[in-house]
UniProtKB/Swiss-Prot annotation:
Gene Ontology molecular function: ATPase binding; peroxisome membrane class-1 targeting sequence binding; protein carrier chaperone
Matches recorded under PANTHER family: PEROXISOMAL BIOGENESIS FACTOR 19 (PTHR12774:SF2)
GO CC annotations, alphabetized: cytosol; nucleoplasm; peroxisomal membrane; protein-containing complex
Name this protein carries in UniProt: Peroxisomal biogenesis factor 19
Function recorded in the entry: Necessary for early peroxisomal biogenesis. Acts both as a cytosolic chaperone and as an import receptor for peroxisomal membrane proteins (PMPs). Binds and stabilizes newly synthesized PMPs in the cytoplasm by interacting with their hydrophobic membrane-spanning domains, and targets them to the peroxisome membrane by binding to the integral membrane protein PEX3. Excludes CDKN2A from the nucleus and prevents its interaction with MDM2, which results in active degradation of TP53.
Stretches with biased composition (Acidic residues): 12-27
Phosphothreonine: residues bearing it: T236
Covalently lipidated residues, kind S-farnesyl cysteine: C296
Region (Disordered): 1-61
Residues recorded as bearing N-acetylalanine in the entry: A2
Organism: Mus musculus
Positions of the propeptide removed during maturation: 297-299
Modified residues (Cysteine methyl ester): C296
Compartment(s) of residence: Cytoplasm; Peroxisome membrane
């Protein structure tokens, strides 16, 4: 009888230990799952509380979590494998829809790998990346709160060579925020205005030494630059959203015209500020910004 009671006690103790083990495993699983506050995202935090994540946010999370080591730091081994598989799947789908965008992130990864152990270079790369992501998050949030529809964004971005598609439409707000930063008055106007003022004298002094076809392109280029400056000069703090959108579309069109005409004369392009150098190819207006370079575009 005593043996039976002892066996029963052992069984109860085993059940209790099993229950505690299961509860511990569940607790560990819950701890392994990233909360919205710690999830790898470039979206700006919302003080009003957790909200449903947009498809674009999920895509951004997957794109920037580009190494398995990153997943290992956030999850246990099993969840890391699952996250890695999901990332690879997302990248394969993206590669079919936006090969240039995939190339951009591959170059970013390669650039990070070349930083090395030098403290100053690491700090510079980290600072550039942090400021870029912060700028994207801020502008993406502002665009989402502005009430602009995806149809309006598509119209504004159709000059970038981005055809409508499920995967591409979700990143349009980010792409537009990048272009708005690049085409802002603070970035372009001072140098463009200076070049525009010096262009007539350069054209006059180089007409005989410049091939006629190239000289005509320079004349057209000067004309387009004048129009761009006029667009900037027409800006006012009281412009409506409709006016701002119309001006942005006009600026995209003018910048594409400028890109088609090639680079300005080196003597004039040298007036551009360091880091910009009027490299229109680096802006890559016919595709996702940054696809042709590793430069930090938003500072």
């Amino acid at each position: 009888m005593a043996a039976a009671e002892e066996g029963c006690g052992v069984g109860v103790e085993d059940d209790r230990e099993l229950e505690e083990l299961l509860e511990s495993a569940l607790d560990d699983f819950d701890k392994a799952k990233p909360s919205p506050e710690h999830a790898p995202t470039i979206s700006a935090p919302d003080a009003s509380g957790p909200q449903k994540r947009a498809p674009g946010d999920t895509a951004k999370d997957a794109l920037f979590a580009s190494q398995e080591k990153f997943f290992q730091e956030l999850f246990d081994s099993e969840l890391a494998s699952q996250a890695t598989a999901e990332f690879e799947k997302a990248m394969k789908e993206l590669a079919e829809e936006e090969p240039h965008l995939v190339e951009q992130f591959q170059k970013l990864s390669e650039a990070a790998g070349r930083v090395g152990s030098d403290a100053s270079s690491q700090q510079e790369f980290t600072s550039c990346l942090k400021e870029t992501l912060s700028g994207l998050a801020k502008n993406a949030t502002e665009l989402q709160n502005s009430g602009m529809s995806e149809e309006e964004l598509m119209k504004a971005m159709e000059g970038l060579g981005m055809d409508e598609g499920d995967g591409e439409a979700s990143i349009l707000p980010i792409m537009q925020s990048i272009m708005q930063n690049l085409l802002s008055k603070d970035v372009l106007y001072p140098s463009l205005k200076e070049i525009t003022e010096k262009y007539p004298e350069w054209l006059q002094s180089h007409q005989d030494s410049t091939p006629p076809e190239q000289f005509e392109k320079y004349q057209q280029q000067h004309s387009v630059m004048v129009k761009i400056c006029e667009q900037f000069e027409a800006e006012t703090p009281t412009d409506s959203e409709a006016t701002q959108r119309a001006r942005f579309e006009a600026m995209l069109d003018l910048m594409q015209q400028l890109q088609a005409l090639g680079h300005p004369p080196k003597e004039l392009a040298g007036e551009m500020p360091p880091g910009l150098n009027f490299d229109l190819d680096a802006l890559n207006l016919s595709g996702p910004p940054g696809a042709n370079g590793e430069q930090c575009l938003i500072m």
